[in-house]
Structure formats: C-alpha cells, structure tokens
C-alpha cells in the first residue's frame, strides 16, 4: 500500500482506518506479528487503541494517513473491515472496489487497475472544462 500511496498520492486521497486488532496476544497471536514485533493485547479503551494503532503504524512503516475507528467499531461494522480490507470509495461514497479479506485477499494490481481508470477519467474530465 505504501507503494500505491506514493505513486497516486497527488491524485487520490488515501486513508487507513485502524479497527479491531486482528491478532491480539490474548486472543489469536500470529507468527507474522512476532516477526514484525507487533505484539499487543486487545485494547480495553480508546486510549489503548490509539496507542496500539500508533505503534502499529510506526513498526510496520505505514506511510498513509491513518485514523482510528471509534471504540464501538462503527467503521468496521459498516464496511466489514476485519481483519483487513482495502476499499476504493468515490466522492459520492460509492464503493468502487472492495478487496477480499487480507492480507491474503489483497490484489494490489486489481486496485492499481481501478486507480488508473479513475485517474484517466478525471484527467479527461479536467481537459473538457
């Protein structure tokens, strides 16, 4: 995602919404979390969630802007975001692309194809004005 963000940042708005911790140490620990040193128990309040989100962004080297879902998980529920999803949403709030659950369901080339289409359409529209 960092690569796509760097490539399209001046034309597409990117945002990560940190939702429920996918693999907390007290529920379902994954080897990838151990390797990446992303080892956190389930946050018990918004402050803990903010701390974990910030640590994950730093430890994983995420360059995209990030926000945190509220503790009631409204974004996660609205977009079925757990454990990870990639969405492409237009300015009218229509979902143009929804990945399969990640990280195994992520297909960056599918997303790149959609992004290219949007950029081309926007460029043609700007030329007509």
Feature locations, PLM:
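Gly/Pro-rich cap/lid or specificity-loop segments adjacent to the active site
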Residues: 43-44, 64, 71-72
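Structural microenvironment flanking redox-active thiols in thiol-disulfide oxidoreductases
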Residues: 1-60
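Thiol-/selenol-based redox modules, centered on thioredoxin-like
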Residues: 70-129
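Loop/turn elements at helix/coil->beta-strand transitions in domains of secreted/extracellular proteins
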Residues: 9-13, 61-65, 83-84, 91
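Conserved beta-strand termini and adjacent loop/short-helix elements that scaffold enzyme active sites
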Residues: 17, 67-69
